[in-house]
Amino acid sequence: GLVSGKQYVVGLKGYKNTSSGGQIVSAETLSSPVTMVEPKKADVTLKAQNAVNIDGTDTIKSSNAVIDLVSDMNVSGEWSLDSGEMSGTVSEKTMSQSINLDGLEDGTHIITFKGENDSKDGTLSEYMFTVDTLPPRLQISSPNNGGFFEDTVTVKGISDSGAKVYIDAENQEIQEVTVGDDGSFEKTVTLDNSMAYQNIVVYAADEIGNETVPVT
């Protein structure tokens, strides 16, 4: 095959068949030397806006995604999501374009771009991201609603491993606790003992920012 960086010459001869069954061949004509240029494919990256990297995968908390396509040279081509579930074109030569993906289901998705630059050199890029719109679970086992306490109270419960639980006691700073690997959490908070009755509000949030409905 042809090798980039080397020079090649194209030779051309004409011929004519004679009535006697012979053949007349012209002198060979040679082209000027042609250097095979190494293809310079575009470096194209795809990335979801507002993504958070969780366990090595970009994650967004919306079912509507905006994917930014950025190239180091002008490109055009086609994109597809999940082997054709959605698809579109980048018809004009460009170095950047935003791709809108609406109505995505929770889970992992792959978007693929296949295109070429001004020199017709091809390029192929893939990008995997995850959609997570669900908040973590939250169950409070202690304290009991309407219970009597003095200066402190211990809040216990269950949530998703790695989530953050926030405990908001009236007139106190909000306390934060990380849920353990087994899903349990426990935190002792100080109460304002000048108040005869007070609310404690508890809610949880995952790494991407999905929050539970507060529990009082």
Q: How should each PLM-predicted stretch be described?
A:
Residues 1:
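Tryptophan-paired
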Residues 4-216:
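Low-complexity, disordered linker/stalk regions enriched in Pro/Thr/Ser/Gly
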